[in-house]
């Protein structure tokens, strides 16, 4: 029998899950956890029935292409948990996958906790009704989300964001540059995304922007953290024909962000990481045209990047779809590099944001799960 079932959908969920699993094991050293997990959660002691990267698809078109496999995995993992009957289940992000699973487990009497609310405040707010059916307790990472669930009558706890606890309030840029053996001069980080589909869409775009930046700043250096060997391979293919001082770093996104002056970042958790590292950035994103059309019809907010959403303002530029051109990204990055006053204002905004999210999230999550695990 397992004590806790878990499902994390991609690299960011794997990182979030690893932190709170480690916190839980301080009080429950023999805690048995199993489910869909990535390498960091496995390292924390989770038995991976399936690897997280099997779920790492995004957008309507991509999901449709992978739908048979996703449905098969969800059916198998649902049967597994119904048979094993864990004391509780925690779904980490991946709402479209997890809510159906959670609804079936909750209906069978297994408490379901969901960690990281979907962005119902940005689009598809009607999902709150599905969440009410599926989730016994919602754990939210942003302070404004708590009231949304309170108003809907869904038990909720604001736990803060684990990344705000892990990332130092004052990152050591000099140490990171020394660790990467970078010379003096501007450093630009390129973060095209953790999913292979994102890397395929954004890598060449960012590299072309980097070429333009390098033309203006010949002493500039570029770092690109790759989430996997496959991602590094895609970047290598995108680099063909380009002459650029680029370092591809395997899985070192935090070191890259600590070292850089400015970042080009695909929308997602990495934008929050960049803000927590107090780095001015340019946010970009491309999806297939049909996906973009459907998402725009349902959008509620003018921003897509987490730093802007949290600040309720365009603190950093966003370049999406048609506006996501190498020229635009390069010009926006150069504007950051050339304006120290603007950089300082953004850094101060990021510092305020960091303090609001720094809540010792792993301990708060462990505390919220404690009633389900008292005798584990």
Which residue ranges define each predicted feature?
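Nucleotide-activated sugar donor-binding and catalytic core shared by glycosyltransferases
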Residues: 1-376
């Amino acid at each position: 029998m397992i004590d806790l079932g878990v499902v994390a959908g991609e690299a960011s969920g794997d990182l979030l899950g690893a932190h709170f699993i480690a916190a839980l094991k301080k009080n429950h050293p023999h805690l048995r956890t199993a489910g869909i997990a990535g390498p960091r959660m496995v390292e924390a002691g989770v038995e991976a029935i399936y690897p997280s990267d099997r779920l790492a698809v995004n957008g309507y078109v991509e999901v449709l292409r992978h739908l048979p496999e996703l449905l098969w995995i969800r059916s198998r993992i649902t049967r597994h948990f119904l048979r094993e009957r864990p004391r509780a289940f925690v779904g980490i992000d991946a709402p479209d996958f997890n809510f159906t699973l959670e609804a079936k487990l909750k209906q069978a009497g297994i408490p379901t906790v969901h960690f990281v609310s979907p962005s119902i405040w940005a689009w598809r707010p009607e999902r709150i009704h599905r969440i009410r059916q599926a989730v016994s307790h919602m754990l939210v990472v942003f302070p404004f989300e708590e009231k949304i669930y309170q108003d809907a009558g869904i038990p909720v706890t604001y736990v803060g964001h684990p990344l705000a606890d892990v990332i130092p309030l004052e990152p050591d840029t000099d140490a990171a540059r020394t660790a990467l053996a970078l010379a003096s001069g501007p450093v630009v980080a390129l973060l095209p995304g953790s999913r292979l589909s994102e890397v395929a869409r954004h890598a060449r775009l960012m590299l072309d922007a980097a070429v333009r930046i390098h033309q203006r700043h010949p002493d500039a250096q570029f770092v690109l953290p790759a989430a996997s060997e496959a991602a590094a391979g895609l970047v290598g293919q995108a680099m063909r024909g380009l002459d650029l001082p680029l370092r591809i770093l395997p899985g070192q996104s935090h070191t890259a962000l600590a070292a850089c002056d400015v970042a080009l970042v695909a929308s997602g958790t990495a934008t929050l990481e960049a803000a927590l590292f107090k780095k001015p950035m340019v946010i970009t994103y491309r999806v297939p045209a049909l996906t973009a059309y459907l998402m725009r019809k349902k959008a509620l907010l003018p921003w897509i990047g987490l730093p802007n959403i949290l600040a309720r303002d365009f603190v950093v530029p966003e370049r999406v779809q048609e506006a996501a051109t190498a020229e635009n990204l390069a010009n926006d990055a150069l504007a950051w590099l050339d304006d120290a006053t603007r950089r300082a204002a953004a850094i101060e905004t990021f510092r305020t944001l960091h303090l609001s999210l720094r809540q010792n999230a792993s301990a708060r999550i462990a505390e919220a799960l404690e009633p389900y695990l008292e005798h584990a």
